[in-house]
């Protein structure tokens, strides 16, 4: 990785000192670096942001000096898209490394690189990283949390690609000096702040990215029904402007706030990466139905009565709560995206199906309202479909919980304890850890033992590995010869994460054959 970084820096330096023609317009700068994404065997999306309206040319070559055959793609950038450029480049050759840059006269961007996916007909190994939850908000000129060191460690893995899995900004961070983002300019500014972290821009430059949003790109825990329409539109526009995501989306669902950003990427014959949009179509939460008469919210409504009493809860949740949580008319994905997911799972020939999920699908009962457990009917439908069709090696790759949590996925851990899939939760990059959040919530409730109770709930469900107090990312590796895949959780120093309660247990998982 160091050799690649040195090469890119050298190429960028040579380009930067090229003379500007006499009489040229003011030099163009590229304050947020470059990025590539949504890579296929034959195409990629290239991204940058200029500092002014202009016409850029994207140059793409297998030669890092751009001296040999170079493809060129012009693109106008305007204030209407905050001077961002997004260019789909094609046709490319499968399983090749490409270098790219943007130019305007003598102004040249940093050089980025990506690798195209191998042909879907051929066996191919793949090694990629994923994480999410990056609050780069500054407090008096200093990071509220850290310098995104987790992303530096992830870059050092030399991954084939990076999955930027939700909460790519915190538009509603408690540390924002002007309060939550509301206007389009507010949201755009949050992306510019995060791009001020070299550890993020260096990773985006060094490999390609598959990105999806979660809630903090708009506002915490938003759904498609109750979200303010203008804030939703502003947050979505800013996300699409600032991430290398293909803007032309292929699914249409009139029942959603907007078309879901569902995509599927094949990496050789062995791996599918299925990206879900779990915000654009979801029904409203049902917290009001799960609130007791005294105004307190049920902390674990789906936990069986004996376990509820063990944790000091009433034997039963409020009347109507479970019916609301399991209402089959409520949706998490929307009917069109749900059917697209089931179709891909059923008919994909890939040995491994990695489902990129913004929120956790495993059961751990505590405050289920904003994740899959809070939409019980659709969750059960998808898991039962996987089981009924004997679909193997389905693995959910997840963030959002601000913790490492690895476990089997069941329809019901107690009533139907047959493993159907696996889930590996990682993160965060830069925000409060789960342990910090739970401790603060417990303090507000007057319960100093809430962290211990949550750990007890994880013990109850037999969590394979957990660490609630670490910044982390995950490394996924597919071995086509052995027919296996592995997932390894690592911290911001690149060290393997271990279970918080069993230090000898490494947070790793083997999938397949």
Please report, for each region that a protein language model flagged, where it lies by residue:
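Secretory targeting and sorting signals
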Residues: 1-24
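Metal-dependent phosphoester/phosphodiester hydrolase catalytic core
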Residues: 25-513
């Amino acid at each position: 990785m160091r050799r690649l970084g040195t090469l890119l820096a050298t190429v960028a330096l040579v380009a930067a000192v090229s003379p500007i023609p006499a009489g040229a317009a003011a030099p163009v700068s590229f304050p947020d670096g470059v990025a590539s994404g949504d890579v296929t065997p034959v195409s990629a999306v290239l991204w940058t942001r200029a500092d002014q309206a202009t016409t850029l040319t994207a140059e793409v070559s297998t030669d890092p000096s751009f001296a040999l055959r170079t493809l060129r793609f012009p693109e106008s950038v305007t204030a209407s898209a905050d001077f961002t450029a997004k260019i789909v480049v094609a046709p490319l050759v499968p399983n090749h490394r490409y270098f790219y840059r943007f130019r305007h006269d003598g102004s040249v961007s940093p050089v980025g690189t990506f690798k195209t996916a191998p042909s879907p007909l051929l066996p191919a190994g793949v090694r990629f990283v994923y994480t999410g939850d990056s609050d780069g908000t500054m407090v008096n000129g200093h990071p509220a949390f850290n310098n995104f060191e987790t992303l530096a460690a992830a870059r050092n893995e030399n991954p084939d690609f990076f999955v930027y899995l939700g909460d790519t900004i915190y538009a509603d961070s408690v540390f924002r000096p002007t309060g939550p983002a509301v206007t389009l300019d507010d949201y755009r500014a949050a992306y510019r702040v995060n791009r001020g972290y070299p550890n993020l821009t260096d990773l985006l430059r060094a490999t390609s990215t598959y990105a999806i949003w979660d809630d903090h790109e708009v506002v915490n825990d938003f759904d498609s029904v109750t979200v303010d329409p203008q804030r939703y539109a502003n947050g979505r526009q800013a996300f699409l402007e600032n991430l290398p995501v293909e803007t032309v989306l292929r699914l249409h669902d009139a029942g959603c706030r907007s078309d879901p950003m569902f995509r599927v990427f094949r990496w050789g014959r062995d791996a599918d990466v299925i990206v879900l949009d779990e915000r654009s179509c979801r029904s409203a939460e049902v917290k009001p139905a799960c609130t007791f008469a005294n105004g307190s919210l049920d902390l674990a409504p789906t936990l069986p009565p004996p376990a509820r009493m063990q944790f000091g809860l009433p034997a039963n949740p409020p009347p109507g709560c479970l019916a609301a949580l399991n209402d089959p008319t409520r949706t998490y994905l929307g009917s069109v995206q749900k059917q697209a997911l089931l179709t891909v799972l059923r008919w994909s020939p890939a040995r491994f199906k990695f489902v990129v999920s913004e929120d956790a699908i495993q059961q751990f009962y505590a405050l289920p309202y904003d994740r899959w457990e809070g939409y019980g009917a659709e969750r059960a439908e998808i898991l039962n479909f996987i089981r009924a069709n004997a679909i193997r090696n389905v693995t959910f790759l997840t963030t959002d919980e601000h913790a490492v949590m690895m476990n089997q996925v069941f329809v019901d851990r107690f009533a139907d304890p047959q493993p159907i899939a696996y889930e590996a939760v990682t993160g965060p990059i830069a925000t409060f850890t789960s342990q910090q959040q739970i401790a603060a919530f417990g303090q507000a409730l007057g319960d100093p033992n809430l962290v211990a109770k949550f750990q007890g709930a994880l013990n109850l469900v037999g969590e394979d590995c957990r660490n609630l107090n670490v910044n982390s990312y995950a490394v996924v590796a597919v071995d086509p010869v052995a027919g296996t895949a592995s997932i390894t959780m690592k911290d911001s120093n690149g060290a393997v994460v271990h279970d918080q309660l069993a230090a000898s247990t490494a947070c790793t998982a083997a999938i397949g054959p």
